[in-house]
């Protein structure tokens, strides 16, 4: 069995990203994570959920891409989808502001949970550009190699799909614009939904209705942003 065979990854992504698992950065990233585990550090999300964004949204099903920075670093929060938390965990402040904008934009009632899996299941690729984090230590895994992998994911989906919407909230996400073919995709930008910045343009951005309008104009089914009970 090769190393590649042991990677639990949805087949379309596994094929599209196959060469990345042979790159030197990936070996270095694997060794870094092994050493962190050996040192007794708690890593989020749990191993089987690290690739949840890819496993939930196959490459040819992607309609929308939302970019986050790194996973939530509190116990029980992260499950591999940016901005989302596991059932039973209160919605973090940035997600609360996302809900506020959904209410303003589409009159969607604010849910009592923060589990966004249904968006991923409909074709929203919810990708953190750094895919792991150490407990209680935000950005601890930034610069360790994930950035090369997730940059390639952005390039692949931009190349592969005909009419996507990219939602780039905050300076970090907007730094990835160079990877996106803006001649065929809709790229929507705003400040981050964090309480520190949301009032400077995220609240009022209308990104959710604009996303669905673009999808419908291009013959795609719009996203149902209403979340089912978790």
Swiss-Prot record:
It catalyses: Hydrolyzes single-stranded DNA or mismatched double-stranded DNA and polynucleotides, releasing free uracil. InterPro entries: UDG_fam1, Ura-DNA_Glyclase_AS, Uracil-DNA_glycosylase-like, Uracil-DNA_glycosylase-like_sf. Its main location: cytoplasm. PROSITE patterns: U_DNA_GLYCOSYLASE. Its EC number is 3.2.2.27. Gene3D superfamilies: Uracil-DNA glycosylase-like domain (3.40.470.10). One of its GO terms (cellular component) is cytoplasm. The active site is at residue 70. It is found in: Cytoplasm. GO terms for biological process: base-excision repair, AP site formation via deaminated base removal. GO terms for molecular function: uracil DNA N-glycosylase activity. It comes from the Bacteria. CDD domains: UDG-F1-like. Keywords: Cytoplasm, DNA damage, DNA repair, Hydrolase. Belongs to the uracil-DNA glycosylase (UDG) superfamily. UNG family. Excises uracil residues from the DNA which can arise as a result of misincorporation of dUMP residues by DNA polymerase or due to deamination of cytosine. This is Uracil-DNA glycosylase. The gene is ung.
């Amino acid at each position: 069995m090769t190393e590649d065979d042991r990677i639990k990854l949805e087949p379309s992504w596994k094929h599209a990203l196959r060469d990345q698992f042979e790159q030197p950065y990936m070996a270095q990233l694997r060794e870094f994570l092994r050493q962190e585990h050996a040192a007794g550090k708690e890593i989020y999300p749990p191993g089987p959920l690290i690739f949840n964004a890819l496993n939930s949204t196959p490459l040819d099903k992607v309609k929308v891409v939302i970019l986050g920075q790194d996973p939530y670093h509190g116990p029980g929060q992260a499950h591999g989808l940016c901005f989302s938390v596991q059932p039973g965990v209160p919605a973090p402040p940035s997600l609360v502001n996302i809900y506020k904008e959904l209410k303003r934009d589409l009159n969607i009632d604010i849910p009592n949970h923060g589990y966004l899996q249904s968006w991923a299941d409909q074709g929203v690729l919810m990708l953190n550009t750094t895919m792991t984090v150490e407990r209680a230590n935000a950005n601890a895994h930034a610069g360790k190699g994930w950035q090369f992998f997730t940059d390639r994911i952005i390039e692949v989906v931009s190349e592969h799909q005909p009419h996507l919407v990219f939602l780039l909230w905050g300076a970090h996400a907007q730094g990835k614009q160079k990877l996106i073919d803006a001649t065929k995709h809709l790229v929507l930008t705003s400040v981050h939904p964090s309480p520190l910045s949301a009032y400077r343009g995220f609240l009022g951005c209308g990104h959710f209705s604009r996303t669905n309008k673009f999808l419908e104009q291009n013959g795609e089914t719009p996203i149902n942003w209403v979340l089912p009970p978790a």
